[in-house]
């Protein structure tokens, strides 16, 4: 069996805690630096994020602020969350630097691409929500507004709504990584996942039903990408399994 690095085995607990503290501080510093750079543009960032809704507001209608501090707090909160999202590569790099010494070499070869793909897929999920889901969703909401009701959304409630969807779609797009990990660590095998494909498809549509307006088109916009991402995870999980099986069979046999 491949031994873990001696440097990791010999490090005392205090050294581990000191390194953890240092990496946490670097992660926080990265978030704060990005926030400081973006804070001047906080109003513009909020205008950009609210554009999908404002495009469907009736002529002359605007968003409203029901709280005294909402005009300041909503852009502030949004900019802070955007800073956290943008700092994810730095945060994951610090996480990688902390856990890498304790990994086997073959684990390192897989872990780094998984972390990078996790970030990219999370960003892809957010972009999909903004460019595809939001226009359809807000267009639907505007079309079903009862007659005599003015559609004037509070900026704080809108922010909470879109942040929830950003996070939901970002996590939903992590399906390939989750599927790959389940196969790689041996919790499930490829055959079981392929046999459960009908249940996965139904589950994707259930998630789509929960996260999108109650129309088939919007549900399909989320369900189909989730299913395709699941298939991608199964495909790469099967490939890594096929690579590892010959390596295991070629290993030294016990006398």
Swiss-Prot record:
Protein location: Cell membrane
Broad class of where this protein is predominantly found: membrane
InterPro entries referenced in this protein's UniProt entry, alphabetically: Sec-indep_translocase_CS (IPR019820), TatC (IPR002033)
Similarity remark: Belongs to the TatC family.
GO molecular function: proton motive force dependent protein transmembrane transporter activity
TM helices/strands, residue ranges: 28-48, 56-76, 80-100, 121-141, 165-185, 195-212, 216-236
Listed name of the protein: Sec-independent protein translocase protein TatC
PROSITE patterns named among the record's database cross-references: TATC
One Gene Ontology CC term in the entry: TAT protein transport complex
Domain of life: Bacteria
Purpose of the protein: Part of the twin-arginine translocation (Tat) system that transports large folded proteins containing a characteristic twin-arginine motif in their signal peptide across membranes. Together with TatB, TatC is part of a receptor directly interacting with Tat signal peptides.
A GO BP annotation: protein transport by the Tat complex
């Amino acid at each position: 069996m491949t031994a873990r690095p001696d440097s990791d085995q010999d490090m005392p607990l205090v050294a581990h805690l000191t390194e953890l503290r240092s990496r946490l501080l670097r992660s926080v510093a990265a978030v704060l630096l990005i926030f400081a750079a973006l804070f001047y543009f906080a109003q513009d960032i909020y205008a950009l994020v609210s554009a999908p809704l404002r495009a469907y507001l009736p002529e002359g209608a605007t968003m409203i602020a029901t709280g005294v501090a909402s005009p300041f707090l909503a852009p502030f909160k949004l900019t802070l969350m955007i800073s956290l999202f943008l700092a994810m590569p730095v945060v994951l790099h610090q996480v990688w630097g902390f856990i890498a010494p304790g990994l086997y070499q073959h684990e390192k070869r897989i872990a780094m691409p998984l972390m990078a793909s996790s970030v990219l897929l999370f960003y892809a999920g957010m972009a999909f929500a903004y460019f595809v889901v939001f226009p359809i969703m807000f267009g639907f909401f505007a079309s079903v507004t009862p007659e005599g009701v003015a559609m004037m959304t509070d900026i704080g409630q809108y922010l909470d709504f879109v942040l929830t969807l950003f996070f939901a779609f970002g996590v939903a797009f992590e399906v390939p990584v989750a599927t790959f990990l389940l196969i790689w660590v041996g919790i499930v095998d490829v055959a079981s996942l392929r046999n459960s494909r009908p249940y996965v498809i139904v589950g994707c549509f259930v998630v789509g039903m929960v996260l999108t307006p109650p129309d088939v088109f919007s549900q399909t916009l989320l369900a189909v990408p989730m299913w395709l991402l699941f298939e991608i995870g199964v495909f790469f999980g099967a490939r890594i399994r096929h690579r590892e099986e010959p390596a295991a069979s070629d290993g030294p046999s016990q006398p």
